[in-house]
Amino acid sequence: MSVSNLSWLKKKSQSVDITAPGFNPLGGAGKQAPQASKPPAPKTPIIEEEQNNSANTQKHPSRKSELKRFYTIDTGQKKTLDKKDGRRMSFQKPKGTIEYTVESRDSLNSIALKFDTTPNELVQLNKLFSRAVVTGQVLYVPDPEYVSSVESSPSLSPVSPLSPTSSEAEFDKTTTPDVAHPKEAPPASTVSGIRPARVVSSTSEEEEAFTEKFLKINCKYITIGKGTVSGVLLVTPNNIMFDPHKTDPLVQENGCEEYGIMCPMEEVMSAAMYKEILDSKIKESLPIELDQLSGRGSCHSKKATGVSAEDADPRARDQGNDSASTAPRSTEESLSEDAFTESELSPIREELLSSEPRQEKSSDASSESVQTVSQMEVQSLTATSEAANVPDRTSSNPGALSHETGLSGLETATKGGDKATESLQEVSGPKEQSTEVKGQDNQDSSHQESSLQQEAGEDSVSSGETVELKEKPAVLKDQQGQELKRDSETEVEELRKLWKTHSMQQAKQQRDTIQQVSQRESKHSSAAADAHGEGSSLLKEKRRHRLHKFLCLRVGKPMRKTFVSQASATMQQYAQRDKKHEYWFAVPQERTDHLYAFFIQWSPEIYAEDSGEYTREPGFIVVKKMDESEANEAPAGEAAAREWEVVSVAEYHRRIDALNTEELRTLCRRLQITTREDINSKQVAPAKADLEPESFRPNLSDPSELLLPDQIEKLTKHLPPRTIGYPWTLVYGTGKHGTSLKTLYRTMTGLDTPVLMVIKDSDGQVFGALASEPFKVSDGFYGTGETFVFTFCPEFEVFKWTGDNMFFIKGDMDSLAFGGGGGEFALWLDGDLYHGRSHSCKTFGNHTLSKKEDFFIQDIEIWAFE
């Protein structure tokens, strides 16, 4: 009975399979009829398994067409190998990436560092479930040469339909190779109701914009006294971190420990963007390229501003010439920027993009330059006289400078490398004709300049038509102008014929001759250029602001150094607790808006208070955002240099409270109202003044032979708080215990207080050190940040711990040292306590404590506080 029930259940399951969407009645009819006619018979498990496998293989080809759309939907059946391959093949290669094969020593962090990205970005690109990678694994990494274009990204369209991907097309080929007539596509209504295949890729720029939760900016970290280093500023919602580039010269010299910093976002009190740095200390650390970004042509900037087109354009003739590349490039940049920013000729750049006008202008310019060279070779004396006449004509006609400067900017944007010789020919042409017409020198030059200005106007109007030199001749009013017009047309035809016959050797001679002429002209034009020095400085300032802005971060606690141990970083933070916590970065101008937008997303909502909704605690509040209209009216100073500033909520309330308190005090003074604070301050101030000298006079067990009373008072003000109130006990003195370092160590036994060492050398100078622990023999350095060194030579100075290292005290049997770093000690004594040495060191940032680096010890006193 059990066997009959089993066969009945199998028939039932087969009848259900007939209605399955992938069932093929033609393929299954031949098999189902014999099974129905046979009587039920007992079957072994092996036979049942073979029949189930054969049934699955019969149904598989008919269902391949449906797998294309349904392979991501769980049907409750066992997934086949083809289905897994289809899922794997649907992973598209993201745009802007290349394939990278993991090597044996690679990790996800090392791969991210190699391709200038982050491990999180690699995880998102490759849809990884962990950060573990294996050798031979293929990963998609960002292509450094990829340039994203908004026009070519189809994902930017929000209404674009889902189109079949290349992986789906390959899936069709691999899964249905033997089907001659595939199943017809269902109607559109059916397709819309079916869930499309999942495409595992994130190449959309919109999606990247939403998933990118950090800023990665290449900038420069400006330190105080330690130079400026290049690196990467990483700004995340939780931290701000700067990693220096290992290839930077200062990093290679001083190490990464000096420049790698990080702080939590909660510690940031203020972030402000400045056009320039006004602090003199920070300004001294600026490199030349940041302080004067236009300094590449500083020696030529004055000349470039005042020189006319015939002077500047020949120097900008050949940009590929290495021997004279600095001056021409800087001159060309200054002239082109002046022409297009001040004369507003920028539309010409877009109008002259067609190749035909540019080629014809280049050929005309080159042909004219060839004739210029031939004329210079035949009549060198005439060329010299013409070069001498250039400044005369410039000074005689003040309007010529502006016209020619605008023309040079126009030629810079349109004619490329051949523009210089054409302008030289245009200058020399009228001068040769002026020798024939002796009495009308200035008139001809003014006519020629007006014609050049008219030609520039015609260029700005016509954008697509072919422009030739003969189609825009000089238009002159008198008969002489008509003759010049006909002569210019004739010269153009002759010049075109001459151009075909000249070789590269003549072009080289032409460049040499032009450089000689430009050198002569630059000497004569230096006087005219000095008058425009003020305009040149303004151009430098404008260009500097155009390239870099300065980000100032003010934090509540010092930033922690990232390339040192946790203990060292904590101690360095403690050492810098009393300093001004301000950090400056030179940021590219195009990233300043990104920083502002990044901080803005934590600012409170504008209408949160009106609507009564307060969703989250705000992070930053905008206190200053300068508009263009305000920038012109802003007064000089720090407020004018600051473009925007965002502050934390705590800092905002602190400023408001300080402002209200100051306004309240001002109002009380104006109304002559005496507050309780004023009364208390007047009563307490005299008492403090009387008690202050007494409070800093400690009791000494023995009179000091090295320190005066006023020196003791000065030292007491800088002692650690745990020593205040304790008497000074003399535990060691050379006059009492002798000059031996071993004896000094024996007298320190059993002490548990800071000790003060005072030294007097043979020159009569007094200096010393305060040790946080008694002196002892040690294997390495010991002590805490309470240790400092001091000197009274020539005036009293105290050098406390800088936080750079933890080399405080080192005791050996034959020496005793304070401070270290770079192989130098702040103070070093030998085993006989007779010879000593002092040098500047990083631990305390001190200078030489004595008059001379090497000194002889006359007397020593060591005081304990107990």
From Swiss-Prot:
Keywords: Mitochondrion, Nucleus, Phosphoprotein. One of its GO terms (molecular function) is oxidoreductase activity. Highly expressed in brain and testis. Residues 705-866 form the TLDc domain. The modification Phosphoserine is found at S90, S201, S202, S204, S294, S334, S336, S346, S488. Residues 543-570 are annotated as: Mediates oxidative antimutator activity. Residues 1-92, 150-202, 293-540, 682-703 are annotated as: Disordered. Transmembrane segments: none annotated. Signal peptide: none annotated. GO terms for biological process: adult walking behavior; cellular response to hydroperoxide; negative regulation of cellular response to oxidative stress; negative regulation of neuron apoptotic process; neuron apoptotic process. GO terms for cellular component: mitochondrion; nucleolus. Residues 364-399, 448-465, 502-519 have a biased composition (Polar residues). May be involved in protection from oxidative damage. This is Oxidation resistance protein 1. It comes from Mus musculus. The gene is Oxr1.
